[in-house]
Design a protein with these regions (language model features):
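C-terminal output helix
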Residues: 2-12
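Residue-level recognition of oxygen-bearing side chains
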Residues: 4, 30, 179
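The C-terminal output helix
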Residues: 13-26
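Surface-exposed, interaction-prone regions with an acidic/low-complexity signature
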Residues: 33-36, 45
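Metal-dependent catalytic cores of enzymes that make or break cyclic nucleotides
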Residues: 40-209
Length: 209
């Protein structure tokens, strides 16, 4: 039966409210993405790191045949993965000397802080486990939850590999960068040391050669 005028008006208003809400959520996500990039730009040694990690993680996801949705998710996660560092003081993040145990504990909180920052946005819910768990280790010695092996979400395992790789081929205040070939070789040599998923690491090295 045809809509009554008042019913139609109510439905239109509801749709407009939903559209406005979606636009606000999209804007909030854009703010977080922009904030993540801006956070790095303060430090010449990390500038561009997250964007590179996002792009290379997506490329690797394609290489191993993950679905398009997961390719898009891991690219976004790569850009945002260190957003939690906004809650860590610059005097700790940019310290060139040896970190104290307390400072290390502060830095290790960035994964949990990042998850909390992104949690209110439904559109980012799929990447929350990647943000929280990208510093877990295959042997269970990582943080924040000490997950082991396949308990760690596959996209967090991917990000862990790519994050380390980009750090190795980029300049840092405490060391010079190494070549892509040397970084891939070094990671392959350390594949059984317990940091990464050894099968995924082999695939990554294969892609980089």
């Amino acid at each position: 039966k045809p809509f009554k005028s008042i019913e139609l008006t109510t439905k239109v208003r509801s749709l407009l409210k939903l559209k406005k809400l979606q636009e606000e959520l999209d804007h909030s996500e854009s703010v977080i993405l922009t904030l993540a990039v801006a956070l790095e730009s303060k430090d010449p040694y990390t500038k561009g790191h997250s964007e590179r990690v996002g792009s290379l993680s997506a490329e690797f996801a394609v290489f191993i045949g993950l679905p398009e949705k997961e390719q898009a998710s891991i690219k976004k996660a790569g850009i945002i993965h260190d957003i939690g560092k906004i809650g860590i003081g610059d005097h700790i993040l940019h310290k060139s000397g040896v970190l104290t145990k307390e400072e290390i504990r502060f830095i290790e909180q960035h994964t949990v802080i990042g998850e909390k920052i992104c949690k209110p946005l439904y559109s980012l819910s799929v990447i929350l486990p990647i943000i929280r768990h990208h510093h877990e280790r295959w042997d269970g010695e990582g943080f924040p939850d000490g997950l082991k092996g396949e308990q760690i979400p596959i996209m967090a395992r991917i990000l862990s590999i790519v994050d380390t790789f980009d750090a190795m081929v980029s300049e840092r205040p405490y060391r010079r960068p190494i070549s892509i070939e040397k970084a891939a070789k070094k990671m392959e040599e350390e594949k059984n040391f317990g940091q990464w998923d050894p099968v995924l690491l082999e695939k990554f090295v294969e892609m980089m050669r």
